[in-house]
Regions:
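Short arginine-rich
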Residues: 19-22, 45-57
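C-terminal structural segments of small proteins and small subunits
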Residues: 65-91
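Helix N-cap motif at beta-to-alpha junctions
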Residues: 35-36, 75
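Solvent-exposed, charged/polar functional surfaces in cytosolic regulatory/catalytic domains
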Residues: 16, 49, 88
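N-terminal first-folded block
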Residues: 1-34
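Amphipathic, hydrophobic secondary-structure cores in small proteins
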Residues: 56-65
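Solvent-exposed alpha-helix faces
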Residues: 44-45, 87
Length: 91
């Protein structure tokens, strides 16, 4: 479990992430794809990273779109681990 970030730390961490937002205490981004199977492949990649980090997001899989939502439940808010996960799936 990590330390909950302050609002200033959250704002600073968001600067390095394109199109991510904070919604109801979650770090969220919707990723768009050319077809459904591309989205499924992306979700699989997210799952692999989540297992490696032992930090698991919520994934909403829709036609040509996957929405990723993450926070550190054990800490009760956003931590550096959430932003590290976001950075890894962007890479």
């Amino acid at each position: 479990m990590g330390k909950i970030l302050t609002s200033e730390e959250v704002a600073q961490s968001l600067e390095g992430l394109e199109s991510w937002a904070i919604v109801e205490g979650q770090l969220i981004k919707a990723f768009k794809f050319g077809d459904y199977l591309e989205g499924i492949a992306f979700a699989g990649r997210c799952g692999k990273i989540a297992e490696e980090m032992n930090h698991h997001p919520d994934l909403l899989i829709q036609w040509r779109k996957v929405t990723v939502s993450i926070s550190t439940h054990s800490a009760g808010g956003l931590t550096a681990l959430d932003f590290e996960f976001a950075d890894k799936i962007e890479g």
